[in-house]
């Protein structure tokens, strides 16, 4: 049964953080219009819209030349991206060309707000060259009712996630696409009432494609499942490894924040080379 399959998530979860605002992602809604206000008003042709965007961009560029405000550059890029999305988003969301076999693989007819539908959308985004795609399933915070809810949540996630990896592979996209599946923490190994609490001392994630070894289990917890005890990977190690697979040296990539240059791995992090293909 469904239990909150639609995946609304707070916009702050998709924020660029301390990175420059031009790295801000575009939020796709799970149901209804995927991106709001992407359609031109009635009577406005694409060529007229192009003229409006060009005129606005010219004014924005003049303002930037005078003010040197980086936020203006962000606005310029956003206007241009919004114009491109007016033609690309409708094509992206048109699933009429997907075969029954593909829809059955994901277990979704598409556009129903389910995690499986979002996985299918992720594959279509990857095909079109979108470089970073983030999917959420918000149903994992099992402080209560875990025996029932963990089964329902896993059922909603497993098929779509597996289908995404299989589909990327059969289309020749997996070697160039890194799939990272996980959350920001795990759950306690002992029951707390009818659920489990947040736990950062030991938890698992999986990676597929994009330069990592397949079929490898790396690291282990103690016998209680409480503390990571073997081949411990810190979060900054994970981030350093992801950046390495993207061709980025995590020790050299920095951004100004709060008066100093920050790395995405702060002052730590090492590439976990044992998991690299």
Residue ranges and their predicted role:
Residues 1-277:
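Ligand-binding pockets and gating/stacking loops
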């Amino acid at each position: 049964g469904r239990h909150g399959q639609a995946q609304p998530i707070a916009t702050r979860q998709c924020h660029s953080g301390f990175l420059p605002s031009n790295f801000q992602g575009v939020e796709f809604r799970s149901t209804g219009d995927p991106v709001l206000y992407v359609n031109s008003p009635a009577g406005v042709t694409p060529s007229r819209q192009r003229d409006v965007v060009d005129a606005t961009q010219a004014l924005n560029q003049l303002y930037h030349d005078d003010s040197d405000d980086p936020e203006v550059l962000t606005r310029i890029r956003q206007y241009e991206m919004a114009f491109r999305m007016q033609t690309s988003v409708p094509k992206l969301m048109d699933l009429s060309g997907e075969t029954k076999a593909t829809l059955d693989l994901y277990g979704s007819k598409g556009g129903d707000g389910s995690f499986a539908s979002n996985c299918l959308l992720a594959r279509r985004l990857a095909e079109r060259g979108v470089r970073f795609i983030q999917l959420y399933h918000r149903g994992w915070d099992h402080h209560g009712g875990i025996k029932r809810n963990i089964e329902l949540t896993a059922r909603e996630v497993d098929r779509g996630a597996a289908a995404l990896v299989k589909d990327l592979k059969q289309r020749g996209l997996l070697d160039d696409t890194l799939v990272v599946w996980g959350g920001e923490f795990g759950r306690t190994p002992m029951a707390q009432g009818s659920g489990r609490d947040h736990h950062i001392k030991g938890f698992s994630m999986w990676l597929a494609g994009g330069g990592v070894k397949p079929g490898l289990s790396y690291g282990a917890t103690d016998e209680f499942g409480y503390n990571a005890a073997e081949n411990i990977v810190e979060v900054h190690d994970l981030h350093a490894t992801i950046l390495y697979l993207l061709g980025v040296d995590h020790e050299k990539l920095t951004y100004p924040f709060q008066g100093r240059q920050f790395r995405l791995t702060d002052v730590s992090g090492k590439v976990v080379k044992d998991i690299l293909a």
